[in-house]
């Protein structure tokens, strides 16, 4: 049973990795300067588009925060407020995958790989340094974070 599950996971991952299609996952940017309203970081599956007046600052540490199953708790906002209250000026990127459909086991793989492609695009297009990225997952979001290495 464990081998079968591993094979199913690997085969599903391979399908996602080869796809550059957009899926219903959104990336929200919070900084110390926009705690009330996030900035949308648009990702089409291969490239990231930032607003011309973006608050994203590649020179600051980046926290990638992934909510749990269903996304009822806005954990990204909670982290953004906590870091701001501590006087820490970070890029907080919330990964919103609440609109995904299907079994959670498949979703965490797909969202993890998609998020990895998003980060790869930030690295290639905006010179993000991987060592400045700290992924944080809450509940099922931890499983998403665990899939960031699949590309």
Place the predicted regions along the sequence by residue:
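Glycine-rich nucleophile elbow surrounding the catalytic serine of serine-hydrolase chemistry
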Residues: 67, 136-147
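Flexible, membrane-associating and regulatory peripheral segments of lipid-active enzymes
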Residues: 1-94, 98-108, 116-130
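Conserved hydrolase catalytic core segment
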Residues: 151
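Extended hydrophobic secondary-structure segments that form protein cores and membrane-embedded regions
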Residues: 9, 133-138
């Amino acid at each position: 049973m464990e081998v079968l599950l591993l094979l199913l996971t690997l085969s599903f991952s391979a399908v996602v990795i080869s796809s550059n299609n957009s899926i219903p996952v959104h990336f929200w940017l919070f900084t110390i300067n926009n705690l009330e309203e996030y900035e949308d970081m648009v990702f089409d599956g291969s490239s990231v588009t930032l607003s011309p007046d973006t608050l994203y600052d590649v020179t600051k540490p980046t926290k990638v925060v992934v909510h749990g199953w269903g996304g009822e708790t806005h954990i990204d906002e909670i982290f953004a407020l906590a870091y701001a209250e501590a006087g820490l000026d970070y890029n907080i990127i919330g990964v919103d995958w609440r609109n995904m459909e299907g079994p959670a086991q498949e979703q965490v793989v797909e969202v993890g790989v998609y998020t990895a492609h998003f980060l790869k695009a930030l690295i290639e297009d905006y010179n993000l340094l991987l060592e400045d990225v700290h992924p944080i997952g809450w509940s099922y979001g931890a499983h998403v974070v665990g899939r960031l290495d699949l590309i």
